[in-house]
Amino acid sequence: VNNIVAARPQRGLSKADILFEIKVEGGITRFMPVFTDYKTVGEVGPVRSGRDQFFRLILPWQALYIHEGQSVVMQQYAIDYDYGKLNNNDGANGYRDYGRVNWAGKSYNAGSLALEHTMYTNADNIANYISSQNVDMNRTYNSTFFNFVDYRLGTTRDLSNSLDSAYSDKYGPVVSDGQYIEIEHSQSYKTRFIYDESTNEYKMQQNYSDGQWRDTVDEAADNKVLTFPNVIVLYTDIHTYPGHEAKDLQYVEYA
């Protein structure tokens, strides 16, 4: 899902079970909302092209990956792993909302918003794609996406010797309570999460081109502010793929 400033606000993000934000080319970020059940997606977008840093996260789960267009690296990954029809490259027959108005009052119909900020898809389109292409969506998973401690056992995990402990001195204690989290993806793209004790959730905000922080909202859900019970920040190396400097395609080191 597009997250360049001009594309905001997005649709459908509040229904995601997991929302990933990762830096891509040019210092911008994009979102990948992950849904357990595609029937609950509603409308989602603006849909943009696929990148391998997102694809590699969902690859072990054999999830349906929907996007519009893809980088050459992403395309090669899909070929190498024989992802077939699970890699959808047209937004599940995505459609244009030429009249959508962004946060700054700009629209494609008014000649002030680029075309790439206007594509959306929805649960019906996804269902039609799955049905018409006979895509196998049956999965049996033996674990969750992240390996959390089972809260029902009342135990904690000793992280003192974990790989994350290397970040303790620089970024603060790994397991401390977080009232405020700010992530600087690049000089222009920053995200922060503010903890609300009354709800036990974090409210998401993003920095805009005018220097102001604004709530991240889902305009398909009456501008509902995105909130999360858990925020996970993954520290890793991100750099340009050798040979892809012209388009600044980013490689994310996951292992």
Question: What label would you give each PLM region?
Answer:
Residues V1-F20, E25-A255:
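A surface/extracellular/periplasmic glyco- and lipid-processing/surface-interacting theme
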